[in-house]
Amino acid sequence: MTLDSYNIFNDEYLFNMPLSPLPKVLGSFETVQSVLTLTTPTLTPTTTRNIEDTIGHLLSDTQPDRGAGCAGFAVPKVLPNAMGAIEALGMGIPSGVNSLPIQPAYDVNLAQGSDSEDSNASYNDTQMNEEQDTTDTSSAHTDSTSYQAGQIMAGSVNGGGVNNFTNVLAAVSSTRGAASVGSSNANTSNTPARRGGGRRPNRSTNMTPEEEQKRAVRRERNKQAAARCRKRRVDQTNELTEEVEQLEKRGDSMRKEIEALTMSKNQLEYCLAAHRPTCQKIRSDMLSVTTCNGLIAPAGLLSAGSSGSGASSHHNHNSNDSSNGTITGMDATLNSTGRSNSPLDLKPAANIDSLLLQHIKDEPLDGAIDSGSSLDQDGPPPSKRITLPPMSTMPHVHMSTLMTPTGASSGSLQTPITSTAPVGFGSAFPVTTNGSSINTINSISQNNMNSPTLNALNKVPKERPNTLAFQRPVGHMHLTLANNNKPGGPTQIQGVPIQTPSTGTFNFDSLMDGGTGLTPVSGPLVPNSSSANKHPLELPTPTAEPSKLVSL
């Protein structure tokens, strides 16, 4: 028997290699079997690939004429386990092979890596190039040990590409025709052991060519989809990067623009500050302009306007009486006074404020209530009363001519307060005719109708008095004036003696008609024939009579 009869030693593997005796090349089967293990958990796909690369370089150095890997697959390796299997089976080796040179034996660790490389076959398959992946059924997807058996492994029922000793023994025994050994090894190889997870096996024995073609198409479609996904991620990343760069450029431009505007603002402020002292067009006192009666006027002229308001309003009847400091008596170009340098045209007139003040009696004023807003008050507004001359020197004047005006523009809807005694009480006072007094009262009333200084004086705070106004009941109202000659007033009302110290202050009529009884009121009001026909606004009120001061 020669070596040519063994298919395992054909020139596919031992091409251009001198033959040598097998006992000198390989160790015993027991030694190799004791070292090799089927499971090598310490090997990783990276170390396995490094071992394969080292073996490939060694083979390429010894075979310079063959293009290693030119057919799309790595050069198969001759491992010691196949040689040991032949020796263990007792196959005779001719003596003519002893003169062959000996190749150095492989390291056991390398043999372990090659033997167990199928345990990581799923990882190695993913690392192959695209030509090998698209051709699933090519010989590039078969492992090294299966290819070492050559056509013998293809002749087995389901070799499955499992790299173990049972497949090698089954291949050798099937080649030699040993039926018993071949059948037992074939039974053990029917159930290939899957050592670890990963992808499905590259080649399935029960798969039809149509299914293999479908698998190839499906894998190609999956690869294209994965490539599209990667491209989409790359494009999205590039778009985001470009957007970030654009935003950064925009931010830089905005910062530069802000700096330029700030510099321009500083320059303008500097120029303005340098020009203001030398500017003759705008005066500093004309910058603050206030309004008066809807007209623009400088603030410095309000004092002059307030001093001459009485005289101006006396000559200009279209002025507003309810505002103090009214500037009137000007020309129609008052709106331009804030921009002109000419003084205002104020007409001098006699100041009649001193003449009016001597006829006006000061009364307390509630500062929380405006005297002009009489509609917001419940009671009569606090008005100014004119001190009349003695009643003995006053003529019999009608009530409507002696009403004290509260201002031309006050708009009060409340009952006017008369300044004289009611007509019903007229017989109690000796009245004489004096034309001079009538003229004096009428002139004072006319001046008060046009003068705005009454409201101006109402806003001036005054001292609060310590006495209350009390009016003693007088007149022919069925009062018994038996003790009229005695000081202190009447002591009887309709024959009933008054024994209380108040003397008519808290009587029934005053409690019912004059208020709560706690405020000073006048005597009981008894209507007569003359006052019954008067207008309700002209009826006498408890505060209508001339008041007297009574110490509490």
Swiss-Prot record:
Residue numbers spanned by region Disordered: 110-145, 177-234, 304-346, 365-390, 514-552
GO CC annotation terms, alphabetical: nucleus
Biased composition (Polar residues): 111-127, 177-192, 333-343
Region (Basic motif): 214-233
Compositionally biased residues, Low complexity: 135-145, 304-325
Keyword annotations from UniProtKB, A to Z: Activator, DNA-binding, Nucleus, Phosphoprotein, Transcription, Transcription regulation
Domain bZIP positions: 212-275
Location of Phosphoserine modifications: S342
Organism domain of life: Eukaryota
Single Gene Ontology MF annotation: DNA-binding transcription factor activity, RNA polymerase II-specific
Main location: nucleus
Family annotation (InterPro entries): AP-1 (IPR000837), bZIP (IPR004827), bZIP_sf (IPR046347)
Family according to the record: Belongs to the bZIP family. Fos subfamily.
Subunit description: Homodimer. Heterodimer with Jra. The kay-Jra heterodimer binds more stably to the AP-1 site than either of the two proteins alone.
Functional summary from the UniProt entry: Developmentally regulated transcription factor AP-1 binds and recognizes the enhancer DNA sequence: 5'-TGA[CG]TCA-3'. May play a role in the function or determination of a particular subset of cells in the developing embryo. It is able to carry out its function either independently of or in conjunction with Jra.
Name under which the protein is recorded: Transcription factor kayak
The organism of origin for this protein: Drosophila yakuba (Fruit fly)
Native organism taxonomy: Eukaryota, Metazoa, Ecdysozoa, Arthropoda, Hexapoda
